[in-house]
Amino acid sequence: MAGDLQDRPCERRLMMTTAHFMHTAKVPIVQIYTMQTPTEALACIEAGADYIGVTPSARGLPGEIDINMAQAIFSTVWTRAVKVALTVETDLIQIADMMRPLIPDVLHLCPPTETFTPDQVRQLRALINPHTRIMHAVSVADHSAIDEALAFAPVVDFIILDTSTPTIAGIGASGKTHDWNISREIVQRVSIPVILAGGLSPENVAAAVQAVRPYGVDSLTHTNRYVSENVFVKDIDKVRAFAAAARAVDA
């Protein structure tokens, strides 16, 4: 079994996450959004990404792609990294239908706050592939984020702590940090892995890891290179610097 897992890093990482229910990590995993081509995904993995995220959508989200491109990315990545699919949709059936051809390792739910109840997430779990884990986004605007994280922790596999912005649908992609003291309290109080997002960059991720001690860290905005006002690609040098800085923090 151990030998097989050495050849399947994606499964090994997921086993480490869910079997041991680590809510902190000596070396945080690195999640990078958002992949727009297979080549970009492979480059991010080579630069240090453990989890790679895609945004299959037609809502005008940053870096969104269609389902066919998302499938191509996941097929190319295969077991080289944990494959994450993000959705801001609010209809359970629509989400399940969208995920059916993708079969992500992790489904990242980030519709607006209070869209779903824990019971609805349980219903969604019954509609998707049983091997797909669920990551629930919590907007850390104030201390009410703690109550939300505690309410959803029993029904999901990960919590991701992010920062909302009124200009983008759902939770995240703001490029702004939030109160890391609240995030640290959530990490300490829930019994599932917590990924810290929201304005993280190569310059501040080490301080974030030191302050919060999350299971993982996530970056979108500050590892991009803009080719026009609303069009970006991943800046692989920034991804590499982000991953290195996150992992350089002393345990």
Residue ranges, per PLM feature:
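Conserved N-terminal beta1-alpha1 strand-loop-helix module at the mouth
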Residues: M16-Q123, P130-T167, I171-L196, L200-G216, ...
